[in-house]
């Protein structure tokens, strides 16, 4: 009798554990309830008022509204009359059009006229911000979708941005986005 009870208890524990550990891969509407940080400007706009803003962004830095579709975070902040001063672009560039490992030059964004500082150019560690580029910045925003794999440079870029922010005593807002590959974790 005792052996049967232990077997039943063990089976129940294994089933419960497997429900927790193994992901539920079916698609449901709950995923549409995720609201990314960029879509919640109203929650942090008081931190941006009367500040010169630097934005670390790329083509994934978008806001979605059912009535307007996709709008880039930079365009949205400018439309709301925030003082976006500079854009810092990671590997693949601000618009995401550059190939892997390309040395990208600084440029001017055609749409906004803002200076884009390449964080993946010559004479710099990939993702590193030069202190001189932060002289006219009061606050930094980081909004880049990561894909949850180790070899992507975006998480390293965030690391360097955090270091530069701390070194220059500049507040940093990190706008979170869900990891699209979060259901599967593997490796050493």
Residue ranges, per PLM feature:
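Glycine-rich, charge-decorated loop segments at or immediately adjacent to ligand/cofactor-binding or catalytic sites
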Residues: 95-101, 173-188
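A short helix->loop->beta-strand "cap" motif at the edges of active sites that frequently abuts
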Residues: 82, 167-171
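Bacterial Sec-dependent N-terminal signal peptides
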Residues: 1-30
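Glycine/threonine-rich flexible loop motifs
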Residues: 146-158
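Short internal beta-strands
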Residues: 83-92
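N-terminal phosphate-binding or glycine-rich loops at protein starts, especially the Walker A/P-loop
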Residues: 33-82
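Glycine-rich oxoanion-binding loops at beta->alpha junctions
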Residues: 105-137, 149
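Short acidic catalytic loops
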Residues: 138-147, 173-176
């Amino acid at each position: 009798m005792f052996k049967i009870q232990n077997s039943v208890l063990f089976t129940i524990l294994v089933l419960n554990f497997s429900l927790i550990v193994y992901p539920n891969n079916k698609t449901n509407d709950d995923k549409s309830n995720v609201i990314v940080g960029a879509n919640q400007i109203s929650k942090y706009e008081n931190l941006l008022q009367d500040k010169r803003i630097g934005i670390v962004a790329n083509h994934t830095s978008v806001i979605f509204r059912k009535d307007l579709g996709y709008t880039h975070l930079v365009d949205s902040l400018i439309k709301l009359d925030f003082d976006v001063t500079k854009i810092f672009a990671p590997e693949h560039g601000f618009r995401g059009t550059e190939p892997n490992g390309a040395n990208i030059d600084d440029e001017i964004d055609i749409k906004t006229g803002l200076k884009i500082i390449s964080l993946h150019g010559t004479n710099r560690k990939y993702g590193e911000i030069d202190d001189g580029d932060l002289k006219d910045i009061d606050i930094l925003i980081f909004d880049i979708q990561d894909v949850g794999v180790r070899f992507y440079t975006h998480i390293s870029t965030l690391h360097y941005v955090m270091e530069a922010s701390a070194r220059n005593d500049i507040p940093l807002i990190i706008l979170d986005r869900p990891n699209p590959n979060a259901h599967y974790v593997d490796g050493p």
